[in-house]
Amino acid sequence: MKKTLTSITLLLVGSLVYYFIYGSQQITQELKRQVDMHLEVLQKNGFAIEEREIKESSEHFVLHYKDPTKIQKYFKEKNIKMKTDDTQMLKGFKLASDISYMQGFYSAVSMDLYPVALPEMIREKTTQNDLNKMQKLLKEKIFLIHLDINKIFTSFKGYVKDIDTTFGTIKVVSTQVKFDGDFTTQRLTASTSSIQEFSINTATDLNISLKNLHGTYKQKGDSPYSFDSKQQIDMIAIQLSNGTSVELKNLDFLNNSNSSDQRINSQFISKFAELHIIDTQNRYSIENLNSKISLEKLSISALETLQSIDINNPKERQKLNKAIKMLITDGTRLNIEYIKANKVLDSSTNKMVDGFDANAYFTLNKNINLREIQSNPFALLSAVESKAHISLSDSLYNIAKKRAELSLILLFVKPISKEQKKIFDITYQNSHLKINGNQIF
């Protein structure tokens, strides 16, 4: 028995030694061949490969965004949509890649990606002093993404290097940005991501901060349009130059999408525990603001056509109009299943009062005339059909009446009173608007 165990142990050790010495070398050569093949494709499609250095188990190169016209055509063939203006803006951008092969037990390929040259358009519009500062930051690899791909090419993990730096009058902080996921040869099948903190602070114009974001994505089945995604954020704060500030706490976003028979049905759910808006004169606060919106029977064919069209190309205008008509007249329906708030701040008393709830749906007439709408946008009103239900607490209704922009409307629109609530049932059909059964126009 002891000899058997010893033999098995020696066999395992020998196998591992063979793998790490000989098998690893063979795999490294195959990985290098694959990289060569992909770089050759990129070179034929507008990119230039510069400063390439190849070593036994690693290599370095710089990917130069050189020919925007060729690159845009290549991206279009790969179903990656980029506007012509956006494509031109990136001309001259350079991204360096440091690749290591077969590092450790997990990784087949490890890479660091970081910019080494700004687009020409940015360089031309930047002062030499600021350009020198930016170039110094690029040399320090301030913006760096690390990525590991596992040895059976089914999953990945990575992170973004922490940032705490200043660009002129703009301070940027980013900490603990991590991601991982699973994939096949065709597409991403699952992923998670997290950000501990992200903020942009300017001297005068705008300050934005975000804390503790966690996101997940999971594909369902073979269709890229069938998936579940979820994001949770502890806090988002925005400070504007005019003194207005916005703060949101404990945010949840869920998106459930399913596809069948060339149609997409999606649900979007959002939850905000707290929303605070403060300007120079007023303060607005809402507790437990929740919504659920669904989009039904969205045409996959029309959506994919729209994604492939260059809207700046006049030759594709007819194709664009056809896709839009298919998208909006093929039974597509938008449902606002609910938008509701538990409590709303009465700023005059600084006390929270009962809130509101609402629901609605919108559809478009299948016989819509796009040419008429293009020449007369108001013609769209005759093609819309909608119903809505809005319920305000008595306290919130009394607050609304005090606002100048609403008081005049409420003089002509009388609500239904029921269970300490004010109710508005709204119908819009055939260019006629009714509220609580009374025709407004």
What are these regions (language model features)?
Residues 1-13:
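N-terminal Sec-pathway targeting helices
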Residues 6, 19-441:
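Glycine-rich, small/hydroxylated-residue low-complexity segments
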